[in-house]
């Protein structure tokens, strides 16, 4: 690989200016405040409750075993949700700081395979869907031709799920 070309590519990517997408920021913030599960956003784990204990738990071994299994499942779900919930909160904290800035840039790096990645891990153009949705180009440009629109439509259909691009009328 010609290193000057690689460096030029990285520098070009790093010149892209970003801003926080305010409507998406407000939506995610409201969902988090109201424990509303939307897409990949986790509910607040503190709102998850253990199943009620059966009235005959002391005398019915089968009921005790079943309740323990259900409670164990809830505890596991709480642990997984807590991890995701904390990650979303950290992303939102970054977005809160960045939303008051007129625009910002990402530093990028490349690995030994020459794949390019943004250095920040949480709020970046290559992280989770909700994180990417919080970002928008400061200076957007219209899509070029119908091929650009088709690629955009197919990507959106894939995110929606269960859509065969061969069946799309584009």
Question: Which residues fall in each region the model found?
Answer:
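Non-catalytic nucleic-acid-binding interfaces of large nucleic-acid enzymes and RNP effectors
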Residues: 1-170
């Amino acid at each position: 690989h010609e290193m000057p070309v690689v460096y030029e590519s990285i520098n070009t990517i790093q010149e892209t200016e970003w801003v926080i997408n305010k409507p998406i920021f407000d939506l995610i913030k409201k969902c988090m405040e109201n424990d509303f599960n939307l897409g990949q956003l986790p509910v607040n784990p503190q709102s998850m409750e253990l199943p009620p204990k059966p009235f005959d738990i002391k005398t019915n071994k089968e009921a005790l075993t079943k309740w323990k299994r259900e409670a164990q499942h809830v505890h596991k779900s709480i642990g997984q949700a807590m991890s995701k919930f904390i990650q979303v909160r950290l992303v939102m904290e970054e977005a809160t700081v960045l939303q008051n800035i007129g625009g910002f840039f990402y530093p990028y790096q490349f690995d030994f395979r020459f794949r390019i990645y943004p250095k920040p891990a949480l709020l970046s153009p290559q992280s989770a869907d909700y994180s990417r949705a919080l970002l928008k180009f400061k200076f957007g440009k219209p899509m070029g031709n119908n091929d650009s629109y088709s690629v955009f439509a197919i990507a959106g259909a894939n995110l929606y799920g269960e859509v065969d691009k061969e069946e799309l009328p584009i």
